[in-house]
Design a protein with these regions (language model features):
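Extended, subdomain-level signal for the structured scaffold at the beginning of enzyme domains
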Residues: 1-107, 117-119, 136, 148-150, ...
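Small/polar loops that bind or transfer phosphate-bearing groups
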Residues: 9, 130, 163
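Structural detector of well-ordered beta-strand residues that form the stable sheet scaffold
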Residues: 107-108, 129, 148, 160
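Short, glycine-/small-residue-rich phosphate/pyrophosphate-handling segment
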Residues: 122-140
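A structural motif
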Residues: 141-146
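Amphipathic alpha-helical segments enriched in hydrophobic/aromatic residues interleaved with Lys/Arg
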Residues: 147-163
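Short acidic alpha-helix initiation/capping motifs at coil-to-helix transition points
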Residues: 164-168
Length: 205
């Protein structure tokens, strides 16, 4: 069964946070199809609207669909941003995150995307992680369960959170592992030439 995965695009989002899991999922699809198997993921980018926005650094991005027209999802991936305070105060953005989390069976974030999930109420009572520099700030919130350092990702069941930036690759591989199997995840890690630890260990804490 093909699983529908939406990646949220918004002004100021980090490119590596977005592109890491996006590339992993597309690569997993390509490897599956090469073996004569159906692609496990339907990957779509979604935004508050379908007008161009600029990611952090200025690169233009264009979402394929609006959040309000997405329908049911299996997974939503929320990237992070540099200006976390501005992101958590952005009412329309948080409303979009909340809507996507409600529509999806599984929510995921990369880096400071965890703060957007928290602001949307998705991390209450759940373990989570984020960029190592932002762990104290995430711990200071009262709407997050245990905040875990020293991990590339933390799987809390309904929500998976990734650490900083390049951890989006590891989070993407974990999603492939969890949803499509260890063998495809390992093959995907080899294809993208990324050293992957299926246990999500990380030297930074």
């Amino acid at each position: 069964m093909t699983m529908r995965v939406a990646l949220l695009v918004f002004a100021g989002c980090d490119l590596l946070d977005l592109g890491g899991p996006y590339e992993v999922l597309l690569t997993a699809n390509r490897l599956a199809e090469r073996r004569g198997q159906p692609a496990p993921f339907e990957v779509v980018t979604v935004g508050l609207d379908t007008q161009p926005v600029r990611a952090y650094g200025g690169l233009g991005l264009l979402a394929e669909q609006r959040v309000d027209e997405v329908g049911e999802l299996d997974v939503v991936v929320v990237p992070g941003l540099v200006d976390v305070a501005a992101g958590t105060r952005d009412g329309p953005l948080i409303a979009a995150v909340r809507r996507l989390v409600t529509a999806a069976g599984l929510a995921a974030s990369v880096c400071t995307g965890a703060f957007l999930l928290a602001e949307a109420g998705a991390l209450r009572g759940l373990a989570a992680t984020t960029h190592h520099e932002d762990l104290p700030e995430l711990r200071a919130r009262d709407d997050v369960g245990e905040v875990v350092g020293g991990r590339r990702w933390v799987d809390a069941g309904a929500v998976v959170t990734g650490a900083g930036l390049s951890s989006g690759l590891d989070l993407g591989l974990h999603l492939v592992d969890r949803l499509a199997g260890r063998e495809l995840a390992s093959a995907t890690a080899t294809q993208i030439e990324h050293p992957w630890d299926p246990d999500g260990r990380h030297e930074a804490s």
